[in-house]
Design a protein with these regions (language model features):
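N-terminal onset of structured domains
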Residues: 1-275, 282, 297
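Short, low-complexity, glycine-enriched hydrophobic/amphipathic alpha-helices that associate
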Residues: 277, 281-301
């Protein structure tokens, strides 16, 4: 995870910058949502002395947006950190600036069990020198799941749901505590026992210090005389006691509620991502978690 770029706005002979991200302990990912992102900014002086006024890290996400012209793609900077500055970098010298910053709780998950989910996250380093600012190339950022996120995705995989895709949607989900200007959707193919009722299920995690909001949306199948429609609901879970819960049973209950209890949703209300969701479910089931790491469509039978 290294990028290097000559700071062109400073002219030939300007300083160069390398930013190296550390892997989180016990994980191949750089960090998890709400966790620390650590690393080092390596600076190498150019042909003359430069006053480094500010070193800034910017978190970037590639998002999709629905517009009148159709689906558009673009990038969003969703967090900035000043990690150094206020010193002179002498010609031809090197300096290392270590940093430790905290990712937003709603930072999307970009990989599961080391496998990329297909979304683009990155860190961009900006150097402010003598009134000029120059941004480096995007350094890929790998973000793994929180324990509760991993447990829920693993349970969905054990139930027979398969991973299809993941993307970042620009906009806000009504009725939630969403903070970022976009949200992640993880699209799953239905488990065999639900294939008659839904075409796919989409999962969105909105993490916060106390736990997760889990938004489930089902693209329901229509019959010969009834159109299909979207059904959705929201659940909340804590970051605590993740290992002691029977996640397969709990998540299966969520899906059953989504498919069965929300079946009439499309007949009396229109759906949009700006409409409030139904009340959350706070169910808790004590049980044994077998620790088998499968995840949706990743190694499941």
């Amino acid at each position: 995870m290294v990028f290097k770029r000559l700071l062109g706005s400073l002219g030939v002979g300007g300083p160069t910058v390398d930013t190296v991200l550390d892997a989180a302990p016990g994980s191949g990912s750089a960090a998890v949502p709400g966790g620390a992102l650590t690393g080092r900014v390596h600076l190498k002086g150019g042909g003359s002395d430069f006053d480094i006024s500010e070193i800034t890290l910017e978190l970037i996400a590639r998002v999709e947006a629905e517009t009148e012209e159709g689906e558009q793609h673009g990038t969003v900077a969703f967090e900035r950190y000043v990690v150094g500055g206020g010193f002179r970098l002498a010609a031809e010298t090197e300096q290392v600036v270590p940093f430790s910053v905290v990712l937003p709780w709603e930072t999307p998950v970009s990989e599961l069990y080391g496998q990329p989910l297909g979304i683009v996250l990155g860190v961009r380093t900006e150097l402010a020198v003598a009134g000029a600012k120059d941004k480096g190339d995007l350094d890929p950022l790998a973000v793994g799941p929180l324990p509760a996120q991993e447990a829920i995705l693993e349970a969905l995989g054990q139930l027979g749901f398969g991973f299809r895709s993941a993307d970042l949607e620009y906009g806000r989900i009504g009725g939630t505590g969403q903070q970022l200007p976009f949200y992640q959707e993880i699209e799953l193919s239905p488990a065999p026992q639900y294939a008659h009722a839904v075409n796919e299920i989409e999962v969105t995690f909105l993490a916060h210090p106390g736990g997760l909001e889990v938004v489930l949306e089902a693209d329901k199948r229509g019959g010969m005389f009834t159109p299909g429609h979207d059904a959705l609901t929201r659940f909340t879970v804590s970051h605590e006691d993740v290992a002691s819960r029977d996640w397969a049973a709990e998540v299966d209950g969520w899906v059953r509620q989504l498919v069965e209890h929300r079946a009439a949703y499309g007949t009396h209300a229109s759906y949009g991502h700006h409409d409030p969701y139904a009340g959350g479910h706070h169910g808790h089931h004590d049980g044994h978690h077998d620790g088998h790491r499968s995840g949706p469509g990743m190694g499941t039978a």
